[in-house]
Design a protein with these regions (language model features):
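Phosphate-binding site recognition
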Residues: 1-240
Length: 240
């Protein structure tokens, strides 16, 4: 069950059922539930999905590009691609994605979900021009394509997609900024999770954790707010 997000779910469903190619960007702070929203709203309707690899601990630009391309290639293989070697560039990688989608095209809507897209744009990788070419040269000419991208690097999404002055200028057909839960939605979340919380404790949780579902997911039944907060913030494996 998804708490709240009614407008966002309705928007995604409308876009899914449109009769034109759709290019959707979803952004918001980390742990706000972007990936969960997309996977629930488009459950069993995603044709291809991939998540960019975190740049943490990747020591140089060449290794970052190689890691991203390898991860993308393995996602293609896992989702049906056959007969192609690992790509050496992003242009080649998106060409392989086109081949996979064409092979699986039965006339129904094809949803492409790329999570943490900004991580894939490593320095001197040529990612953005290749991604632009993928949308402008292939996706935009197919009425059954729905490309959904998201990322926590809001500044990247805004500058390269929403406010792009380059090849993706004006290409987004929809953008969704996902906000934290409201106080009311926090209350609904705890009720659904069968966690007993007083109104005061719900307010405290909202002030401390900001309505971020990820942190609320670590609340345990039978513990007071103070005990839960202590475990989440200062336990052996703190979540903040």
């Amino acid at each position: 069950m998804i708490i709240g997000r009614k407008e966002e779910i309705a928007e995604l469903d409308k876009l899914y059922h449109s009769d034109r190619p759709e290019f959707v960007a979803i952004y918001g702070r980390r742990r706000v539930g972007k990936t969960f929203l997309i996977k629930q709203a488009l459950k069993d309707r995603i044709t291809f999905q991939h998540t960019g690899v975190s740049p943490v601990d990747q020591d140089n630009d060449r290794n970052r590009l190689k890691t991203q391309l390898e991860s993308f290639y393995y996602a293609l293989l896992n989702q049906g691609l056959e007969g192609y070697k690992m790509p050496k560039s992003w242009l080649e990688a998106f060409f392989l994605l086109e081949q996979l989608l064409q092979d699986q095209d039965n006339g129904e809507r094809q949803v492409i979900f790329i999570d943490e897209l900004p991580w894939m744009d490593t320095p001197r990788s040529g990612f953005l021009p290749a991604f632009e070419n993928f949308w402008n040269g292939w996706c935009s000419g197919r009425d059954n394509i729905m490309l959904v991208v998201c990322g926590s690097a809001t500044s990247w999404i805004l500058s390269n997609l929403s406010r792009s002055k380059g090849g993706l200028y004006g290409r987004l057909t929809a953008e969704i900024k996902l906000s934290p839960f409201t106080l009311k939605e926090c209350e609904e979340y705890f009720e659904h999770a069968n966690i007993q919380m007083s109104q005061y404790d719900i307010l405290q949780s909202y002030m401390v954790f900001g309505g971020i579902p990820y942190y609320m997911g670590y609340f345990q039944k039978g513990l007071s707010f103070e005990q839960n907060a202590d475990k989440i913030l200062f336990g052996n494996r703190p979540r903040l």
